[in-house]
Regions:
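Functionally critical mobile loop/hinge segments
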Residues: 8-124
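Cysteine-centered functional microenvironments
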Residues: 1-4
Length: 124
């Protein structure tokens, strides 16, 4: 239903929380890290070229990992007392965004990069 925003956003969120806990962060800092990571995947299209989970999927997952590390570092250096956005609100927003997105941007290979990159590429 949510495509890449959900797949990569949720995995990045979980990784950010786990890393924060592993580095000695509090539970509230872990929630903050999860929120930060997920928030920055909202609205991401899911447009695999040729319907294959290669391009741009591999790079997007790599960027999700980097976002998880960055989110963890931000949360560890911040106080959850000052957070304006909660993980619950971001999860709700992701659900609403997924429902609002056009179907062709949800892993159909009918929009975005899938539409504009030729299938004849050897790399694909």
């Amino acid at each position: 239903m949510g495509g890449c925003q959900a797949e990569i956003g949720v995995s990045s969120s979980m990784a950010a929380a786990a890393l924060t806990e592993s580095l000695g962060g509090t539970q509230r800092q872990a929630l903050m890290a999860a929120e930060i990571a997920m928030e920055h995947h909202l609205g991401m299209t899911c447009d695999p070229i040729g319907g294959l989970v290669q391009v741009p999927c591999i790079e997007r997952n790599t960027m999700g990992a980097i976002k998880a590390i960055t989110a963890s570092q931000l949360a560890l250096q911040s106080s959850p007392d000052y957070a304006r956005v909660s993980l619950d609100k971001v999860i709700k927003t992701m659900w609403d965004t997924a429902k609002d997105m056009n179907f062709k941007y949800k892993e159909t290979a009918e929009g975005g990069l899938a539409l504009h990159i030729p299938l004849g590429l050897k790399e694909c």
